[in-house]
Amino acid sequence: MITALIMAGGEGTRFWPLSRKDHPKQFLKLNDNQKTMLQETVERINELVPLEQVFIATNEAYQKAIKKQLDGIPEENIIVEPMKRNTAACIGLSSVVIEDKYTGSTMIVLPADHLIKDHKRFVDILRKSIMTAATGKNLVTIGIEPTHPETGYGYIHFGDQLHTIDGDQVFEVRNFTEKPDLSTAKEFLEEGTYLWNSGMFIWQLSSILANIETHLPEMYESLDRIKNALGTDLAQKVIRDEFEKMQSVSIDYGIMEKADDIFVIPGSFGWDDLGSWPALERVKKVDADGNVVIGKHYGIDTTNSIIHSPNKVVTTIGLDDVVIVDTEDAILICDKKRAQEVKEIRNILEAEGLEDCL
């Protein structure tokens, strides 16, 4: 039995001001096929996992949007996190809920807001990851073969080759590294033993729960109490009370950096996490001046820029390497090279109490 967990609770802060708290990145149509990121994520795995075996982890505010976008998904398959507790708690809670319904299944864990161009190749890598996860109590992740020195991603350092599956290599993981500076990213690329950390995982439910018990024992105790309450009138109260106690830690730091038997399968299938505005250059048409324009733009000597203004005419003179995003109540203008800092400017607005703009 194969199940899937789609993590769809994030706010997509680096895509502000288009991505908002009440309508974040996973609900946006950033590709040219008029489907949201969430819809694309679910559709690309449908030949492996039928909709009734797909679970969505999110927060209460996004329940209605998910039901609307994923017509036919069972309501009980929408797992609501009572509050923010990072990915380890999210995956832990979801694992207990899924194990209760599909005992003994293998679970695919995917972010809701990534772009994948080569669906066939992606599904092929997933199949091989599932086969690898079934061979023991190992935890499997998919690493992306880097194409350039990227500072916006974490990296996976892989070691010895363990085996191959129909031509695809499976490696042991030596360690996970945080987002590097540019010089370190260049070293990683030259060394050839580093992959981008995609945040995609495949494992048996029993394996991830055993690792939570070993490495996050207090969280496991809370999960065990939740497990015992499922199906009772007290279930929602117990979930809220126990989830609140859980440590806020990422699955990478809490489990993957500490566990034994971590395997990685390199993949190259047109992956992009669309982590910030410059990513649109990789998925949208770029004009003769190197600009990505969504809306109406008239410019003089304006090059290599991203301009998103579907409702207003934007005019520019003498600009290069900038991002301009116009929405009804907020405008972003920034140096394209500093687009990763959009999250920080958003934090400033939050500190100033400008909740309506978030």
Language model features: what each stretch is:
Residues 119-240, 263, 336:
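Conserved core of the sugar-phosphate nucleotidyltransferase
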Residues 84-89, 148-150, 182-184, 271-272:
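A short acidic, often aromatic-flanked loop/helix-cap motif at beta-alpha or helix-coil junctions
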Residues 1-6, 14-21, 32-111, 115-127, ...:
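Conserved N-terminal catalytic core of the sugar/cofactor nucleotidyltransferase
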Residues 38, 94, 113, 156, ...:
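Residue-level signal for inorganic ion chemistry
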Residues 107, 193, 200-201, 272, ...:
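A residue-level structural signature of the nucleotidyltransferase/glycosyltransferase Rossmann-like core
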Residues 1-2, 51-52, 74-75, 102-105, ...:
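Short coil/turn connectors at secondary-structure junctions
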Residues 205-358:
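Left-handed beta-helix
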